[in-house]
Amino acid sequence: MRSHHRHFSSYVSFILFLFLFFISFSSSTSKLEPAKSEPKRKHSVSAILVFGDSTVDPGNNNYIDTVFKCNFPPYGLDFRNKTPTGRFCNGRLVTDFIASYIGVKENVPPYLDPNLGINELISGVSFASAGSGYDPLTPTITNVIDIPTQLEYFREYKRKLEGKMGKQEMEKHIEEAMFCVSAGTNDFVINYFTIPIRRKTFTIEAYQQFVISNLKQFIQGLWKEGARKITVAGLPPIGCLPIVITLFSGEALTNRRCIDRFSTVATNYNFLLQKQLALMQVGLAHLGSKIFYLDVYNPVYEVIRDPRKFGFEEVFSGCCGSGYLEASFLCNPKSYVCPNTSAYVFFDSIHPSEKTYFSLFRSLRPIYDSILGSF
């Protein structure tokens, strides 16, 4: 039986090597509360504007030529009307909870949705694309929207608003918006650790600096376009993602647990990121700009370390299919789905469940209270 498992594990690893070309991630941590139908406006936040990867993509990939989509069941199982919106989740994302909390809208729509009216645009959209990253090579692997193009879409967005409200009012609107940036996992999990191209050029330390330099350039681009309140998420414990365990653990079927060497890469990256953001803050503070680091790693790791404390039962496999390798088209209407999504930290082999996203939002809420106080 063990021999059979070893053969199966080798076969799975081969499949996963190919499949990892089609992945991206998210963030996580306890108890879901019902959404309010009418969010109350807090302070003077005008809009929420979102950039990044599948952590914060509500469905932009629905409108581009990529296989990395999820606009079909069982995705959206716990969303309103069980709608598979294109979110890599059974329900809402962290940015949906944030938008509701700050009072601008209940859920953040994808910018590329052709049916969006001007009022939806005004209150905020997401430009994010699942599978994207800060390294220019990363989004080419799955043919998704790169970060510079997301910034170009934002410029286009500004022109649309200017046509509606005029240049001066548009600029004020952008200054009063909250910007959310969340990416980076794909750069390491898909790109550096899976494809040999970057490993031939960069040590892991040099690659971390390379990714951060690209992030810095993007943040500077946002600032030049008028962003004044920007949140930047760090990496989660990537060694705890079910698909990473399946691909890189020698005991993927018999003793599933976090792989520390991968998560250490995330902690080191997060340390460097915080230093870089602090330096940028010093340079921009006199202009009224604020950059906030969002710690994703520790809230997620706390859930994984002590899941029952947060109301979870299953940590190292996703709810969809076997939970070891399914995501995107491998998690589909024919897949097995666990009977209780709220018991699972992950919905598929990469992406957290709605409950995990809500738990993460709760852990980040004090930071958003601080941000709201700065408007």
From Swiss-Prot:
Glycosylated residues, chain numbering: 340
Subcellular location: Secreted
Keywords (A to Z) from UniProt: Glycoprotein, Hydrolase, Lipid degradation, Lipid metabolism, Secreted, Signal
Disulfide bonds: none
Entry keyword annotation includes Glycoprotein: yes
GO biological process terms on file: lipid catabolic process
GO-annotated molecular function: hydrolase activity, acting on ester bonds
Active site, per annotation: 54 (nucleophile), 348, 351
GO cellular component terms listed in the entry, alphabetical order: extracellular region
Segment forming the signal sequence: 1-28
Keyword Secreted included in the entry's annotation: yes
Highest taxon above the source species: Eukaryota
Any Pfam family hit: Lipase_GDSL
EC number: 3.1.1.-
Record family assignment: Belongs to the 'GDSL' lipolytic enzyme family.
Stated name of the protein: GDSL esterase/lipase At5g45960
Organism: Arabidopsis thaliana
